[in-house]
Amino acid sequence: MKLDGYTRLAAVVANPIKHSISPFIHNRAFEATDTNGAYVAWEIEASDLVETVANIRRYQMFGINLSMPYKEQVIPYLDKLSDEARLIGAVNTVVNENGNLIGYNTDGKGFFKCLPSFTISGKKMTLLGAGGAAKSILAQAILDGVSQISVFVRSVSMEKTRPYLDKLQEQTGFKVDLCALEYVSELQARIAESDLLVNATSVGMDGQSSPVPENIVLPETLLVADIIYQPFETPFLKWARSQGNPAVNGLGMLLYQAAEAFQLWTGKEMPTEEIWQSLTEKYQ
């Protein structure tokens, strides 16, 4: 990697963040595209966020990525938000456009780009969970022309989830159906008519649990996706594949959301195939 007086910085900002594989992805991309840049991980306290954002301008950085807990906290310090960032209410990428700081959320775009030969326009989706990743997938699906979305959460989370879905409807005119995960017959009915089933919960990270009962029957044409990438094959994906359904883990989402950010910063396409090969060797 070339480092000199002209090298521009990018960083991922969160707490904790030292475990992040974003530096691996972006530094490979800088090198492969002959871009004079370097990408680092900054683990900061909340009290340092304002100064961190100021440093984007001060050091003429490409910009930053953000992870928890700063995706929402950063918004007041930005000059402008993209459509999807405004809908989601969270930012994962800040772009420095000649001193103007613009907030984007590339998670949803990254998710849909990682699905092989699939477009969400006119399709039906069942989504498990309503956290940060789920919100980004929801908003992007609406922007991309999805025809129906059924969101399933635990009954104790229904009250907390509804205000965000109401806000989405106010802003887009699109009504999302909210259902309790405990109602298995309703879950089965919604999955049966869906084109895409997504686990956007953390259930399965232990390598043992699954967010849905194993007696659920999947339609033959259903594509199944999990936002988790460690383990590489969750019990949820294993179960879907055992029924003969195509299934995709979360590593592609991580790569393609990074590729979206990289293009916003540099104007260049990330060599995703080359980096995907390196990632699968590292995590499979």
Swiss-Prot record:
InterPro entries: Aminoacid_DH-like_N_sf (IPR046346), NAD(P)-bd_dom_sf (IPR036291), SDH_C (IPR041121), Shikimate_DH (IPR011342), Shikimate_DH-bd_N (IPR013708), Shikimate_DH_fam (IPR022893). Signal peptide: none annotated. It catalyses: shikimate + NADP(+) = 3-dehydroshikimate + NADPH + H(+). Shikimate binds at S20, I21, S22, S67, N92, D107, Y229. NADP(+) binds at D83, G129, A130, G131, G132, A133, I227, G250. Coiled coil: none annotated. The keyword Transferase does not apply. It is an enzyme of class 1 (oxidoreductase). Pathway: Metabolic intermediate biosynthesis; chorismate biosynthesis; chorismate from D-erythrose 4-phosphate and phosphoenolpyruvate: step 4/7. It comes from the Bacteria. Keywords: Amino-acid biosynthesis, Aromatic amino acid biosynthesis, NADP, Oxidoreductase. One of its GO terms (molecular function) is shikimate 3-dehydrogenase (NADP+) activity. Its EC number is 1.1.1.25. One of its GO terms (biological process) is aromatic amino acid family biosynthetic process. The active site is at K71 (proton acceptor). The keyword tRNA-binding does not apply. Involved in the biosynthesis of the chorismate, which leads to the biosynthesis of aromatic amino acids. Catalyzes the reversible NADPH linked reduction of 3-dehydroshikimate (DHSA) to yield shikimate (SA). Homodimer. PANTHER family: BIFUNCTIONAL 3-DEHYDROQUINATE DEHYDRATASE_SHIKIMATE DEHYDROGENASE, CHLOROPLASTIC, SHIKIMATE DEHYDROGENASE. Belongs to the shikimate dehydrogenase family. This is Shikimate dehydrogenase (NADP(+)).
